[in-house]
Design a protein with these regions (language model features):
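Charged, often Cys/His-bearing segments associated with DNA-binding zinc-finger transcription factors
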Residues: 1-42
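Basic, short loop/linker segments at the boundary and entry of helix-turn-helix/winged-helix-like folds
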Residues: 30-72
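Short, conserved catalytic/metal-binding motifs centered on acidic residues
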Residues: 33, 68-70, 85, 105-109, ...
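Short, basic alpha-helical nucleic acid-contact segments in DNA-binding proteins
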Residues: 93-96, 108-132
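Alpha-helical scaffold/interaction cores of sigma-54-like transcription cofactors
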Residues: 76-79
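Structured, charged N-terminal subsegments at the starts of enzyme catalytic cores
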Residues: 129-132, 137-145, 150
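DNA-recognition alpha helix
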Residues: 84-95
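Conserved small/polar residues in nucleotide/adenosyl-binding loops
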Residues: 152-154
Length: 154
């Protein structure tokens, strides 16, 4: 009795296959992904203090909410380097979705962080935390360590 070896079969694979329509980034991101929370919270922020820092004339700028979204998501993903955030905006679907397929470079990201957020970062952070608490996304508890007020996520 001889055993015939069966030939392995594989699913069709053609990386060069064209498709009629490219997939929507919206369809590729799960409904419960944290990137959706970032987008929702940043969209609700009052950014008047940031908008005041922009002067009229010259080349158009990336919208401050776009820049905040990619920075906040970067920080949540432990990505702090403007160069790494730039790379992510070009290659990671979550960043692409947040940025609406816009691609700010590392210099633009860094200038936004150092110039536009310079005096308002604490206010922006406070708004983000407040919105997240109001929406039940986080619970905070006040604790004191060595006399320092700290907020922790429970």
């Amino acid at each position: 009795m001889s055993k015939r070896r069966r030939k392995a079969t594989f699913k069709a694979y053609n990386p060069d296959q064209l498709s009629l329509l490219p997939p929507s980034l919206e369809d590729l991101i799960p409904a419960n992904h944290v990137v959706r929370v970032v987008r929702s919270v940043i969209d609700q922020l009052n950014i008047d203090n940031i908008l005041k820092k922009y002067k009229g004339g010259g080349a158009s700028s990336y919208h401050p909410k776009l820049m905040l979204k990619i920075l906040v998501y970067g920080y949540l993903s432990n990505t702090y380097s403007s160069r790494k955030i730039e790379q992510s905006v070009q290659s990671n679907i979550h960043y692409m979705w947040l940025a609406g397929m816009e691609t700010p470079d590392h210099n633009t990201i860094n200038r936004f962080r150092t110039e536009k957020l310079k005096d308002v970062l604490k206010e922006v952070f406070a708004q983000v935390v407040t919105l997240m608490v109001e929406q039940g996304l986080v619970d905070i508890k006040t604790i004191y360590i060595d006399g320092t007020l700290s907020l922790i996520h429970i």
